[in-house]
UniProtKB/Swiss-Prot annotation:
Gene Ontology biological process terms in this record: GDP-mannose biosynthetic process
InterPro entries according to UniProt: GMPPB_C, GMPPB_N, Mannose-1P_guanyltransferase, NTP_transferase_dom, Nucleotide-diphossugar_trans
Keyword Cytoplasm among UniProt keywords: yes
Physiological role: Involved in cell wall synthesis where it is required for glycosylation. Involved in cell cycle progression through cell-size checkpoint.
Gene name of the encoded protein: MPG1
Pfam families the record matches: GMPPB_C, NTP_transferase
Keywords on record: Cell cycle, Cytoplasm, GTP-binding, Nucleotide-binding, Nucleotidyltransferase, Transferase
Entry-linked CDD domains: M1P_guanylylT_B_like_N
Full protein name: Mannose-1-phosphate guanyltransferase
Amino acid sequence: MKGLILVGGYGTRLRPLTLSLPKPLVEFGNRPMILHQIEALANAGCTDIVLAVNYKPEVMVGALKQYEKEYGVSITFSVEEEPLGTAGPLKLAEKILKKDNTPIFVLNSDVICEYPLRDLLEFHTAHGGEATIVATKVDEPSKYGVIVHDRDVPNLIERFVEKPVEFVGNRINAGIYVLNPSVIDLIEMRPTSIEHETFPILVEQKKLYSFDLPGYWMDVGQPKDFLSGMCLYLSALTKKNSNLLTSTSEEYVNGGNVLIDPSAKIGKGCKIGPNVVIGPNCIIGDGVRIQRSTILKNSQIKDHAWVKSTIVGWNSTVGKWARLEGVTVLGEDVTVKDEVYVNGGKVLPHKSIKDNVETPQIIM
């Protein structure tokens, strides 16, 4: 089995974090985002994984090669000299992806879910088509391209309707596919879209199906969705009684869904949770309140600070009695001084904030 992960470009939507690291290496749930996908592919039986990269490939290579042995996979980097869209990378990696006749998983590196890849493969093999799209149900389909099914053949896709004005369905493309290698023959070696150019051909041939995704789904490519995805991920761990989570018997855990690295130090009288991730070597002072936030490694939250709906970047410091909220994102090595209020600030790396930021803005 083979898998291709569309890693993509600059990660501008997740700045300022991506000014320091490529987006797939930003920790989500205390692991690089892309590692969730590599693990899922390995668990589904993939032995060859291709990462389609066009930004800082050398950083990615250094960071991810170590995982080959751990997961028993071969990781190859397919470096695009120009962005090739969502279909071009398949053509670029054709030699690996078509080396045998087994199906190919394609994953978008921004998507977080429970990755039911074995069930997906079983479904794909059973229907006999050329490709399967994973579909997820949404509350507001008018924001998306919606999947419309054939009335007579279950799960066969009849057409796509982009941002429908009238209700035609509520299933959308979840950014996960399984394809037969022959699909690559439909793709030209140029920047091209699998959604807008390849899939319509398969629809016409009546060879494209959809598979309903159970559980949660989120594109975590921007800060507010990163935090929403974190909540869904932690809730899923709670349902599984995962031993990754910090025990609710700890006196500082407030409301559950808390994931704290064992190396982090927590002060007295803290209330942490619900929905909090704290990375390695973080120091949390006394009387700190953290809710719905991620604190990345080597950061310090000083006594009596309040942190809500915030991502605190690596090696950052939040001062005593400071208050952060409103989807604030601190880049790497940011210092927020004592008693400072930040609401929705996006703070670039290596900055020091000594004045209140009362309205959402970029701090350069």
